[in-house]
């Protein structure tokens, strides 16, 4: 590290808990306890190493100042000479491990917040066996992984359940020929589940996630069939057995008229769903409504904390969005991409 190098800090947030000061670095999702010396250093953004050593000489020797700067650089708290994030990114060669199959670009429901034009994406139809098998062949050919993942999506994927079964059987044959293993997930509205479908999903260990937005009143405001009839009663009945066996996850969607995260979570927890991710319908929320939803989300975080403090760990663990966020902080590292599309997964 040269005396003429300029030091720049990545975006961060400082907060205090019980008189102890912490720094959260947004770039690398790292969390650190800091002292007054580091607080002073943070005020010197854009300064040279030489001027930083001079400013900190009351607190640290020159060697200790360099050691501190080096440690912070290694932890992705700072960079030298204002290197942009784009310049620091390395383009990774794609090694696919997951494939999403849009089995049907059709849906038997007409949810108000659907981003896929009623599940049709302006190109209504169902996937053919040939397309599905070619996609799987491409996945196998372009992956060095031993465990591969197939996600069944729509529209409503159960509208093309025969193809789902053919895909699973095709993957079983590939496993026998190559030794590669496959795991599966399906995201469905749950209204088309039958005893036979449930049996097949269970026997083939296909992890099932259904969409349900909380109470009957709240759910049926936005999740309804073509005739505007609500879906709650049908979903609860169709998933009864799988819920009792702890085999199905519920994904809830927050909207301006259904933004009480705590109420949504507690209702779905009472229905015995194994996990409960909650997301916002971004296409239905304006700035003012977002502020209200943010307030509800903060209350939800405090509720999560309450569950932890009262040792209700099993219940808290179902709040998968918050658990995943904590894991990103615990195992903090730089994420140059929001997801693995085009690098580890494709559709």
Describe each PLM feature range.
Residues 4-12, 332-345:
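Structured beta-strand/loop patches that form or line metal/cofactor-binding pockets in enzymes
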Residues 159-276:
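Conserved AdoMet/S-adenosylmethionine-binding subsite of the radical SAM
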Residues 1-43:
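Acidic, low-complexity/disordered tracts enriched in E/D and polar residues
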Residues 222-233, 240, 244-340:
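Radical SAM enzyme [4Fe-4S]-AdoMet core and its adjacent flexible, acidic
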Residues 27, 117-120, 152-154, 216, ...:
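Short, histidine-centered active-site or binding-site loop motifs used for metal coordination
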Residues 41, 51-79:
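Basic amphipathic alpha-helical segments that dock to polyanions
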Residues 109-113, 216-220, 286-288:
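Short acidic/His/Gly/Ser-rich catalytic and metal-binding motifs that mark active-site loops
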Residues 67, 71, 75-77, 81-199, ...:
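Conserved alpha-helical substructure of the radical SAM core
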């Amino acid at each position: 590290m040269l005396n003429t190098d300029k030091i720049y800090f990545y975006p961060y947030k400082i907060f205090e808990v019980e008189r102890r000061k912490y720094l959260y670095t947004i770039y690398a999702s790292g969390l650190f306890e800091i002292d007054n010396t580091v607080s002073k250093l943070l005020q010197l953004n854009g300064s040279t190493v030489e001027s930083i050593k001079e400013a900190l000489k009351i607190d640290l020797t020159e060697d200790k100042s360099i050691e501190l700067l080096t440690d912070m650089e290694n932890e992705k708290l700072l960079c030298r000479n204002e290197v942009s994030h784009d310049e620091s990114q390395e383009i990774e060669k794609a090694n696919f491990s997951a494939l999403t199959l849009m089995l049907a670009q059709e849906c038997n429901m007409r949810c108000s917040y659907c981003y896929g034009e009623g599940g049709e994406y302006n190109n209504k139809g169902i996937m053919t066996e040939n397309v599905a098998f070619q996609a799987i062949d491409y996945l196998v050919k372009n992956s060095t992984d031993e465990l591969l993942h197939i996600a069944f999506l729509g529209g409503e994927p159960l509208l093309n359940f025969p193809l789902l079964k053919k895909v699973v059987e095709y993957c079983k044959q590939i496993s026998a020929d190559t030794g590669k293993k496959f795991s599966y997930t399906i995201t469905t509205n749950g209204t088309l589940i039958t005893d036979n479908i449930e049996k097949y999903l269970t026997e083939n260990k296909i992890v099932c996630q259904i969409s349900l937005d909380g109470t009957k009143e709240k759910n049926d405001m936005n999740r309804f069939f073509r005739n505007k009839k609500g879906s709650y009663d049908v979903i609860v009945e169709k998933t009864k057995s799988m819920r009792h066996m702890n085999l199905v996850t519920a994904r809830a969607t927050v909207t301006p008229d259904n933004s009480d995260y705590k109420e949504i979570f507690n209702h779905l927890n009472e229905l015995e769903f194994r996990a409960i991710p909650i997301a916002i319908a971004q296409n239905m929320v304006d700035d003012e409504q977002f502020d209200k939803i943010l307030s509800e989300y903060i209350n939800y975080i405090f509720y999560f904390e309450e569950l932890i403090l009262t040792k209700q760990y099993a219940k808290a663990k179902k709040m998968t969005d918050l658990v995943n966020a904590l894991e990103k902080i615990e195992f903090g590292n730089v994420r140059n991409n929001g997801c693995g599309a085009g690098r580890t997964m494709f559709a």
